[in-house]
């Protein structure tokens, strides 16, 4: 299911114009990239505020309708008020179906409770990363990546190279030789010493 957003072209610019928009419950934003020029837009603040709470909104191709014309975009930047529950500005990037995109997608960790290091050794799993940057064509973009922790033993670490991805999805960090950790199973205190004595 694709998330849909409704927006209107924004004619007025500047701090004063944006302040007036916000006082009317509207949110200033911009769309850039793809084959088009940068376009100033305004959106319904309340609608966007609640959509931003959805995990998929941050890592999916979104359908935005500007004055009735639809475009495919990615969320690129959100500026929040320092202490109010208010979005100040939002940026979207146009997506071309024939061009690879770089997107951070969330990691969903499963089977921690049946990992031998947890179940048998009483260890604890530490999530070193909660999202990773991937590169793929828009049609291949996963909403999230599942990380299976069921094989983790005390003291073991899962790395980027251990993640199971579809064949058309790449991890730029791995292409650069950075096989970063994703999760570590921390042994219960004294566990490592006890197991080495046995």
From Swiss-Prot:
One of its GO terms (biological process) is translation. Part of the 50S ribosomal subunit; part of the 5S rRNA/L5/L18/L25 subcomplex. Contacts the 5S rRNA. Binds to the 5S rRNA independently of L5 and L18. This is Large ribosomal subunit protein bL25. SUPFAM superfamilies: Ribosomal protein L25-like. Pfam families: Ribosomal_L25p (PF01386), Ribosomal_TL5_C (PF14693). It comes from Nitrosomonas europaea (strain ATCC 19718 / CIP 103999 / KCTC 2705 / NBRC 14298). HAMAP family: Ribosomal_bL25 (MF_01336), Ribosomal_bL25_CTC (MF_01334). Transmembrane segments: none annotated. One of its GO terms (molecular function) is 5S rRNA binding. CDD domains: Ribosomal_L25_TL5_CTC. This is one of the proteins that binds to the 5S RNA in the ribosome where it forms part of the central protuberance. GO terms for cellular component: cytosolic large ribosomal subunit. Keywords: Ribonucleoprotein, Ribosomal protein, RNA-binding, rRNA-binding. Belongs to the bacterial ribosomal protein bL25 family. CTC subfamily.
């Amino acid at each position: 299911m694709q998330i849909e957003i409704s927006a209107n072209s924004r004619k007025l610019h500047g701090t004063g114009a944006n302040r007036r928009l916000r006082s009317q419950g509207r949110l200033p934003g911009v769309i850039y990239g793809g084959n088009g020029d940068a376009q100033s837009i305004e959106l319904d603040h309340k609608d966007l505020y609640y959509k931003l709470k959805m995990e998929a909104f941050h890592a999916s191709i979104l359908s935005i309708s500007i004055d009735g014309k639809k475009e495919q975009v990615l969320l690129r930047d959100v500026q929040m008020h320092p202490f109010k529950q208010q979005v100040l500005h939002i940026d979207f990037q146009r997506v071309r179906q024939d061009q690879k995109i770089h997107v951070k997608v969330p990691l969903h960790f499963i089977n921690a409770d049946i990992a031998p290091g947890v179940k048998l050794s009483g260890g604890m799993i530490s999530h070193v990363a909660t999202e990773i940057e991937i590169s793929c064509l828009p049609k291949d973009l996963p909403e999230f990546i599942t990380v299976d922790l069921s094989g983790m033993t005390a003291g073991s670490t899962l790395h980027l190279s251990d993640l199971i991805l579809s064949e058309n999805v790449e991890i730029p960090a791995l292409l650069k030789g950075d096989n970063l950790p994703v999760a570590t199973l921390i042994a219960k205190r004294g566990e490592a010493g006890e197991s080495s004595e046995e």
